[in-house]
Amino acid sequence: QKLCTAPPYGFTIAPLLQARLTRPWYRGRIFSKMGLTAVEIEAGVCRRDLPALGWSLEARVLSPQGVDLCANTSASAETTVLALPCTDLPDGTYELGVTLRDTEGKDLASVTGLKLEKVPPGVDELWFDRENNLYINGTPSFPTGFYSLDWAGRMALASEGGYTLFHTYAGSTPARLDPEVKGSWDWPTWLDAGAAAGMRGFLGFGYRGDGQKDFLARLMRGEAPTEHRQMTDFIRRFRTHPAVAGWYIYDEPALSGRTPDEMAYLYRMADEIDPYHPKLACLVFWTDARFNDTFDVLMPDPYPIRAQGSQPLRSVAEAVRAARRTVRDEKPVWPVLQWYKYEGGRFPNAEELRCMAFLAVAAGAKGLTWYSFYHGYKDNAAGWPDVARIGRELRSVE
């Protein structure tokens, strides 16, 4: 048996210089509530004899407005952090670059195209640090909550259980976003109840359209103007509401045949109107990296307890770790855990619920939700005290 079947040429030589923006980490955005005084760029030089060479590194920020900030340091270690003061940096979009030079000032290598954006102060500002922890207006948070928490009158109950997030599938169709359409969702009442309970919602903004498979293609071609208006008006209407946690880009896009371009279109739609809240997506195939640039939070949904073919509970941890690999640990993973039953199956018991939650945390989840409050509270009300006990216990993760 061969010990190695890989060809001898199957390796990659690292470039001499690599660089990336590490602070701010999330989308390269500076928010006012960060209190950030310096932008940090991590530069790596692929040479072991650096101290003896006397090489230097220069980081620079350039913008069309003529802002020119520069920082220099010696390249004496394989990894170096360069700090550029940013307190007085005007709002706008910038490009960063790093150059490696020898002792005579000759350019040896350079990295350009690192994007930086300083946004105007927002009412609410949510972002992630380098470890993918969520910050809400500067306060760290470990978000936990529910899909399909559809009852405004149950927000306080969920909050008493230690939970901070809520959701409804009413946000999946444009017509239910529009207050002028009969049968639309009562968004003000629902969101106000969430805010009063100290909770925040991740809101869909009509991603399923009119239910036709070609809806997003038509939307992108400008052939669905009514739905486009309903979707964008909804984001504008509630982007400063205190109960907004983020925008829900899509629910299991691969199962609906969605493409990365369609997902990216939805991301831009939300982000151009509201850069202050993250964008989330649930992926049933959480090892599919095609969608990596179309969300800020990856939500895998491993449901191990089934009528047939149940999986070990450790599959939850395996899913979280696999999702982290998919995004290269560059984005947070908030798994969707099981609080419902498959047809012919059963609900998870108290031990299984707690095990799933803390397996996810131990595997590196930076938040989690349950699917779903509607199914669980309606059909498994006896399990609510256990779910609430777990929710209060999870608050210790913060």
Q: Where do the PLM segments sit?
A:
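Solvent-exposed serine/threonine-rich low-complexity stretches and specific carbohydrate-binding patches
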Residues: Q65-T80
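Glycan-processing catalytic domains of CAZymes
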Residues: T5-L16, R20-W55, A83-C86, P90-E398
